[in-house]
């Protein structure tokens, strides 16, 4: 039997702290996975469901985008993947009776954890203007409401069409097609808040905004650098790949402000030896200060240039552009400035250099620790410089590896979910569908929030996700959402965005990855693209949580027919009945998807082409891989201030809160904690266990306050602190973003810590 949802929010006023762990996974991970799954699904459903996760005839995990190996284990999932599946396949249900019992104002007082624990949404729900409660409505009435508001807009650009990274390729392609037929490129997505900096940097330097390695490359590498990433919590199956790489002789450098259990030791639950002893992963830990990565890679590049024979001159001469300007800037790198920026010692950097020079095949992996700073784009460009110098792109066992978060965030971008589409993509849409797509750039996430705030956007439609909790500057974001005429969320579960609404609001319940999708032509499957550009099918097997659910492609197709009417030549009804017809159109519009239906029938899927990886061909403006030379930047702190990074707990995936613990960091039963270096804490007079308010400081002079955080003395880098989001998103200014990519700078928030009334 599955457990019942919590009746009230659990008390979190006394978190328990035991200190960080030094190994990840193992028997505890198995126990936590199964316990949480059984609470949501019961014993039988847990077994039947988890054995289908990431299998060739099963469904793609709705969690992270880490690729599946060619040879799958019987249990091809991690602890957090099991939690994600359990959340979706839960037996708990949110019915119209629930909404009758809870006003929207009441829901707004509840925690994200409590909201998510209530279960699966079962019927379309409508909040009328001035009403206190959502009420059930038929699907056709829901589509009528959306159509009323969209067709009443003065311009299509007053509508926003947001996408979460769980959305399938088929749904994403139809969604962007509908938005563009409607007349706007306002297609903000979750990538704007995470790896936009990666895409911006990689497009300019190597000509494609994706990583250049496949899973097999990790097993061929001599050196893997993992920078600004915590695989043990955010991509646990990556630890298996790193373990295999280590067994093959690879060495690993970890660059991060926090020591993380997963990168110290991995206890592989797939093997008896792994569960008992585990494998040490990191050979060298560089405990860098937040935002110091550009300075580190710049100095490493200088040292490579200064080492005779270290530069791959043949590769540089044949395949790159801008080398001389870059080399001049790199040779000017200063040791003292680098040590200040990074907080590292000269000895540690020298040791890293020795490992770099000993490697013929190097991969650099990274995540949000590199992408969410003001200078993130030049930082990632410097990583590319580092790899280009020694010919480490377009070679087996080498390359760039931005590790994406949500399961199809990369696929959604490939399908055209982008506010700044390439002209060639729009030309292909025009040829295939016979309409003229808009050419002007649309709004990304930050600009979309500004547009709602300034009454330039009036309808907000979200295909999945939890926009309010994912976005920066919480008070500004929530006020902006409340100015909209209509907010619409296609969702599987209840979340805070359903309680922060426009004048009118709709919740449209949809099928999950785990569920069967029956349409007019029979049972359907969808496809996804993983973090390494592999495309494969996903087939749900469970009966839908409610007879009233529609799939995401069906929702888009029906809405498009209602809004666009007879003026659209697109066969929306055909697309809803048979997703193979959608894939046929994708094959004709998007390069790399030729013979899509035939190729995706392969149980292993197929790899999308990647010119730098496959041919050492770089489709940039220069026709070569571009070295770049930007001034070195790093955050400079006023006295008595700390640099805060927002991050996830182990019981969390993006904005979904599975529980109130952070097992690997030793935190239990509470999320309002701030991790502070003990020496910094002593200088600031912060006792371990005391309570503090986090107060953001930025150039606009606005006070942004997150009250009541328990101080935890923790071995983070000096001058740095860490706390969980979404609780700390209130501290991230809307306009504090990365240059070029406009990604919120959530990893470099200047804060002061003031004594809390909770003491």
Identify the role of each PLM range.
Residues 575-663:
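Long, low-complexity segments enriched in small/aliphatic residues
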Residues 79-93, 161, 380, 384, ...:
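Flexible, low-complexity linker and terminal segments
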Residues 1-58:
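Intrinsically disordered, low-structural-confidence terminal and linker regions
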Residues 35-42, 50-157, 257-360:
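Cofactor-/ligand-binding subdomain signature composed of acidic, glycine-rich
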Residues 124, 162-164, 645-647:
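Acidic/polar N-terminal loop/beta-strand segments that form early-domain functional surfaces
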Residues 56, 116-118, 156, 359, ...:
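Sequence-level motif detector for i,i+2 pairs with an aromatic at +2
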Residues 134-137, 141-220:
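Long, structured ligand/cofactor-binding scaffold of large enzymes
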Residues 196-396, 403-585, 640-643, 647-759:
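Non-catalytic alpha/beta scaffold blocks inside enzyme catalytic domains
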């Amino acid at each position: 039997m599955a457990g019942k949802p919590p009746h009230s929010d659990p008390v979190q006023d006394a978190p328990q702290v035991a200190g960080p762990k030094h190994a990840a996974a193992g028997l505890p991970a198995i126990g936590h996975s199964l316990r949480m799954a059984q609470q949501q699904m019961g014993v039988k459903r847990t077994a039947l469901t988890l054995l289908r996760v990431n299998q060739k005839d099963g469904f793609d995990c709705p969690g992270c985008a880490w690729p599946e190996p060619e040879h799958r284990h019987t249990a091809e999932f991690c602890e957090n993947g099991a939690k994600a599946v359990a959340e979706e396949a839960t037996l708990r249900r949110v019915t119209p009776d629930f909404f009758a019992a809870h006003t929207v104002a009441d829901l707004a007082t509840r925690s994200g954890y409590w909201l998510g624990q209530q279960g699966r949404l079962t019927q379309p729900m409508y909040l009328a203007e001035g009403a206190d409660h959502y009420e059930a409505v038929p699907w056709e009435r829901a589509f009528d409401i959306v159509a009323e508001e969209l067709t009443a807009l003065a311009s299509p650009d007053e509508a926003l069409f947001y996408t979460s990274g769980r959305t399938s390729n088929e749904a994403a392609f139809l969604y962007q097609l509908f938005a563009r037929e409607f007349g706007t490129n306002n297609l903000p997505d979750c990538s704007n808040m995470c790896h936009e900096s990666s895409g911006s940097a990689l497009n300019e330097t190597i000509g494609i905004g994706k990583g250049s390695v496949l899973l097999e490359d990790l097993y061929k590498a001599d050196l893997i650098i993992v920078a600004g990433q915590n695989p043990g919590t955010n991509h646990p199956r990556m630890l298996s790949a790193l373990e295999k790489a280590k067994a093959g002789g690879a060495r690993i450098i970890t660059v991060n402000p926090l020591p993380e259990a997963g990168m110290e030791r991995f206890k592989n639950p797939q093997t008896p030896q792994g569960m008992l002893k585990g494998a040490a992963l990191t050979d060298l830990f560089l405990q860098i200060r937040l935002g110091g990565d550009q300075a580190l890679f710049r100095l490493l590049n200088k040292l490579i240039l200064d080492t005779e024979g270290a530069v791959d001159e043949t590769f540089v001469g044949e395949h790159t552009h801008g080398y001389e300007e870059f080399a001049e800037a790199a040779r000017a790198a200063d040791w003292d400035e680098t040590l200040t920026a990074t907080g590292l010692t000269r000895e540690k950097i020298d040791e890293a250099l020795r490992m770099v020079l000993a490697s013929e095949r190097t991969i650099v992996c990274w995540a949000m620790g590199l992408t969410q700073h003001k200078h993130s784009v030049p930082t990632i460009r410097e990583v590319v410089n580092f790899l280009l110098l020694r010919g480490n792109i377009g070679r087996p066992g080498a390359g760039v590896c931005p590790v994406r978060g949500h399961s199809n965030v990369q696929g959604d971008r490939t399908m055209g979910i982008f506010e700044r589409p390439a002209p060639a993509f729009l030309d292909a849409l025009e040829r295939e569908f016979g309409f003229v797509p808009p050419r002007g750039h649309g709004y990304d996430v930050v600009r979309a929030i500004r547009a709602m705030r300034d009454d330039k956007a009036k309808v907000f439609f979200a295909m999945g996700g939890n926009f309010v909790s994912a976005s920066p500057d919480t008070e500004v974001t929530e006020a902006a959402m409340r100015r909209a005429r209509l907010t619409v969320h296609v969702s599987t579960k209840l979340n805070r965005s359903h309680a922060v609404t426009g004048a009118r609001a709709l919740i449209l319940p949809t099928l999950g990855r785990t569920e069967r999708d029956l349409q007019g032509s029979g049972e359907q499957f969808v496809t996804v693209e993983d973090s390494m550009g592999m495309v494969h099918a996903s087939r749900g097997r469970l009966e839908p949580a409610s007879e009233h659910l529609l799939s995401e492609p069906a929702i888009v197709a029906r809405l498009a027919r209602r809004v666009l009417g007879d003026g659209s030549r697109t066969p929306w009804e055909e697309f809803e009945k048979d997703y193979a017809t959608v894939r046929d159109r994708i094959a004709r519009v998007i390069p790399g998807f030729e013979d899509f239906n035939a190729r995706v029938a392969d149980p292993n899927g197929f790899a999308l082409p990647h010119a730098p990886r496959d041919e050492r061909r770089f489709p940039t403006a220069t026709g070569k891989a571009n070295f770049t030379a930007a001034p070195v930047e790093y955050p400079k702190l006023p006295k008595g201030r700390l640099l805060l990074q927002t991050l996830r707990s182990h019981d969390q995936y993006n904005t979904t809160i599975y529980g109130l613990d952070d097992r690997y960091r030793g935190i239990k039963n509470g999320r309002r904690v701030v991790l502070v270096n003990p020496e910094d804490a002593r200088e600031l007079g912060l006792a371990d266990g005391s309570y503090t308010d986090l107060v953001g400081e930025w150039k606009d002079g606005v006070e942004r306050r997150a009250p009541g955080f328990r101080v935890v003395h923790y071995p983070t880098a000096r001058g740095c602190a860490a706390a969980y989001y979404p609780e700390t998103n209130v501290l991230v200014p809307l306009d504090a973003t990365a240059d070029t990519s406009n990604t919120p700078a959530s990893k470099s928030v200047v804060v002061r810590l003031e004594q809390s009334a909770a003491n």
